[in-house]
Amino acid sequence: MWGENIATADLFANATDIHSIVQALTTLANASDVFFLVVMGVLVFMMQWGFAMLEGGQVRKKNVNNVMMKNMVDWLIGCVAWLFIGGILCSKGFDLSAFIDWWKQILGTNWPNNGLDLASWFFGLVFCATAATIVSGGVAERIKFSAYVLISLIITGLLYPLFVYLGPWGASIVPWHDYAGSLVVHGLGGFLALGAIAALGPRIGRFVDGRPVPILGHNIPMAVFGAFALAIGWYGFNVGSSLALGDISGLVCATTTMAMAGGGIGALIASRNDVLFTANGIVAGLVAICSGTDVVSPIGGLIIGLIAGLQVPIVYKLVEKAGLDDVCGVVPVHGTAGVIGAILTGILGLKIFGGAGGVSLIDQIIGAVFCIIYGTGLGYILAKIVGIALGGLRVSEEEEKMGLDMAEHKMPAYPEETVI
Amino acid sequence: MWGENIATADLFANATDIHSIVQALTTLANASDVFFLVVMGVLVFMMQWGFAMLEGGQVRKKNVNNVMMKNMVDWLIGCVAWLFIGGILCSKGFDLSAFIDWWKQILGTNWPNNGLDLASWFFGLVFCATAATIVSGGVAERIKFSAYVLISLIITGLLYPLFVYLGPWGASIVPWHDYAGSLVVHGLGGFLALGAIAALGPRIGRFVDGRPVPILGHNIPMAVFGAFALAIGWYGFNVGSSLALGDISGLVCATTTMAMAGGGIGALIASRNDVLFTANGIVAGLVAICSGTDVVSPIGGLIIGLIAGLQVPIVYKLVEKAGLDDVCGVVPVHGTAGVIGAILTGILGLKIFGGAGGVSLIDQIIGAVFCIIYGTGLGYILAKIVGIALGGLRVSEEEEKMGLDMAEHKMPAYPEETVI
Amino acid sequence: MWGENIATADLFANATDIHSIVQALTTLANASDVFFLVVMGVLVFMMQWGFAMLEGGQVRKKNVNNVMMKNMVDWLIGCVAWLFIGGILCSKGFDLSAFIDWWKQILGTNWPNNGLDLASWFFGLVFCATAATIVSGGVAERIKFSAYVLISLIITGLLYPLFVYLGPWGASIVPWHDYAGSLVVHGLGGFLALGAIAALGPRIGRFVDGRPVPILGHNIPMAVFGAFALAIGWYGFNVGSSLALGDISGLVCATTTMAMAGGGIGALIASRNDVLFTANGIVAGLVAICSGTDVVSPIGGLIIGLIAGLQVPIVYKLVEKAGLDDVCGVVPVHGTAGVIGAILTGILGLKIFGGAGGVSLIDQIIGAVFCIIYGTGLGYILAKIVGIALGGLRVSEEEEKMGLDMAEHKMPAYPEETVI
């Protein structure tokens, strides 16, 4: 295996004319696309670990294992739902023949062009799993594990792929510009969470006599490491969204970087040096830039990030004032940041503002409204239906006080610190 | 440096005929292979960090620094052993002239084709280090640090490369299909650990009057983060095993993903929502798919993963019943999962089951038996010899009770929580 | 989006003659360079997370959130400083017209060749941010957050880019061989820290009656995970420094690996199994190899690493003896390791020692001396000026005792373990 090199250069060993060169180049190009989609997809898959740390750090010790299980299991279930349903629904809608062709193909190993279709399937999967796992951060510390698993299954198998199909990545029934999913992934995740949060109700002790009482997480550095891992993975999220090596864009890399910087600085200023808001501001800046990362200038990226970061502490307080317990602030970090990003794309993407053009503010606003209604509405309805189906959406009051780690998984997160 | 772009495109600036184009393409192809092997190798190297977290979370506070040292030092030693011996032994066997040529070459900087041979050497190294570090999880909390270092040196310098040479990646004296090492790396690591565990004996208090008494690790989230890091790295492990960009396979990416999902879901079900078994089930699914990841269908991958995940809690109990103290469950997660994966490759790799064909169940069974005997036998013998050479394999009872962090490294893992 | 493949292979669909093939190849080459620079740059960006863990683990619980904020904010500020000033100053010096052209360009989206210039800009940014964040580890646990932010701004906007411009990556006014920045990044960062440490003074209780009193960090495994993340990122640091896919070098990958091994083993031996020194030895080996990673042999890399690792505990003691409180040992790990690596490049890079040649020991010594003077001098002056500008460089004694997390950020790192 090592030492004897099977080299890609062998492709060109017998290339002696135009035709044979082009044939060899086509193989190299397909292989390069598979490599591109796998590396970018693995970076996005790293965001599952990032979300587990970001959410894990922001919950109490007695619920950390439950967060670990939710973040592992929504990925595991997402893979199966995306293989059998999601991956086809999102591009072909409810076309039964397309499903049957696909089911036949995944029973075999006949995948031409170095398996490019499966690399593309993988890149779609990690986007779907990201949308689903965002909800976890909003409903933490009181949702039943079985309810969360069922909600994840329905999001990854139906709600997300259908939203994709209706939006710009599918049949464009509702067309807006969304290069890497400010609305398709993050806005949807954030507003699905809003609906579920409303259906679920707040944690015990989160509001006392209508007054909000902060419930701090157990490990702030763990949450910051989560933000770092998300920021690293985000380069796969945005730069990978060219879907082909040949269309990769250095501009997307730069606007992603500057929006991250703007998001962190905006939240740092608005929260007066708060560690968690600064970390979440970085994520909000990255959420906001997804939509227009390919059509705004680097300065435009910085501006989008700044606005997205500044709004995080503000919207967090508004959600709290509405009596909603959004544990990890997913509504401001993914919901409203996604909407703001999409709308600003319709402005800073215009040529007069240095953008590449080809965007319309109206389309962006329509997309945003559609996302808010689709997400919040279906998030609420889904949570209520699952609650009925499982005899309740929440663990019992006694279980919530004991902590979900012991109640649902029979194991504390830090055994030597807990008398079992 | 920045701003003035030395671009790869310059390769083609003077390409004016077939010959000059092919020459430039050969350079691009070699450079792309080096880039491919480095990126995939770095993902596998990330698994060293994953193993450090997976094992670190599953030991008590008083032994965490010792786990950190074992996982750093088996890598450091593996680099040296692989440079001087392992990297040649695995492909050329005991051919002295090949060793001499290699030793001359590593004293210099003459490495043609963009140093492709050294990129290939690096990719072989990270596989070797993975096999060695698996043993660490089985022998934790009571092995002498010096004994572990010596065992690692012999595994990375002799036992692993020799096993590679005898198997399908070397001279194929024992031929079986093992695309990314279900047996060559993980089965070997798991059964070497079994042999060493048997030679070492259990931790104090692990069995009382013959009854097993669980000794919980100190940080379950740390272990789960380890499983996430391993899963991320595994895409380098499997997809990188094409060894050349031109042979990359999207099918390998998909079967790896589905086996991960099957492994986690299988262990989740078999352990009734246990956090550690679910995380280890994800790893077991990934171990099992290595062998046939290129010849089974995506559904085949899911099935292999499910079976590998289901068996983890079952085999863990059997090993425990046999009075063996496998701290991190490396026998079920790497040993039996590797064997199951290899054997199922001989079934689900057949054309009648949608596989790509070119596999034989008999070969797979022979390879599995060879791996179990070679690993367990040499693991036991090696541990016994090292024990004799160092005046004992284990730290003293007093040191084991104090904890290896203070006994062997004079520093607690969490200084502010420990009175020194 | 998924399912309908826009493939890179389409580039060659209409390539029917030499000219059209070369045109398509130029696009593929540029896209490959952008992909190369983004992936390598993301690996280096991962080192920000590595530094946050390495430093976070080596400070006490009451200062961990402050370390998180410093490591997030020096990145955020670095992005902005590098976009507006640093990225141009480093290659064009104080050429106003070059600044104006650049500022015009970043207000727009006109970036040819797949945005290759912006990918190159991004790769420069992550190097700059690395140099700045090294200082954080030296000044931890007593510097004002506002002072640190201002120091980072001036390092990333002025001191680092100017040093680059003067050195081998810019106008080469002081020419030495520094492939990936032993001096340009790490030596500079280490000696800037030395100057700032001298200006800042030690932590309360670090020296009692002139005798050094160790102040242990709170989480050694966190620091080791930081070293792992840095080592992973370092492959981007060194292998990415070819700046173009076509010039990638497998030799750089191998010498980087062997220097890492030498560094860890050297520090392990010199510190007699100390966990933190071994982890920092790995980093020191990687620092030292940056300069000559492309011109020394794999054995040369091992030797450079060994020497760099051996010196870490020795220089740490010398700095301590000088009454200087270098919390994370950045002077031996980045400063002197960088100088040693640069000088050894002038020896082991020579042909007689198996090197590729083209290096001069005199140049390397001149570069080292220039770096020590530039770094220590400007580090000291900058810290003093910032101290004056902000009414003091340090937090008050009372704040230092309370801990910077509560004093500067109003939030403990582990809320459930602290009575707020």
UniProtKB/Swiss-Prot annotation, chains A, B, C:
Gene3D superfamilies: Ammonium transporter AmtB like domains. PROSITE patterns: AMMONIUM_TRANSP. It is found in: Cell membrane. The chain crosses the membrane at residues 34-54, 71-91, 120-140, 149-169, 180-200, 220-240, 250-270, 273-293, 295-315, 339-359, 365-385. Keywords: Ammonia transport, Cell membrane, Membrane, Transmembrane, Transmembrane helix, Transport. Its main location: membrane. GO terms for cellular component: plasma membrane. It is a multi-pass membrane protein. The keyword Transmembrane applies. It comes from the Archaea. GO terms for molecular function: ammonium channel activity. The record marks 186, 334 as: Twin-His motif. Important for optimum substrate conductance. Belongs to the ammonia transporter channel (TC 1.A.11.2) family. Homotrimer. Interacts and forms a complex with GlnK2. NCBIfam families: amt. Involved in the uptake of ammonium/ammonia (NH(4)(+)/NH(3)). Transport is electrogenic. This is Ammonium transporter Amt2. It comes from Methanocaldococcus jannaschii (strain ATCC 43067 / DSM 2661 / JAL-1 / JCM 10045 / NBRC 100440). The lineage of its organism: Archaea, Methanobacteriati, Methanobacteriota, Methanomada group, Methanococci.
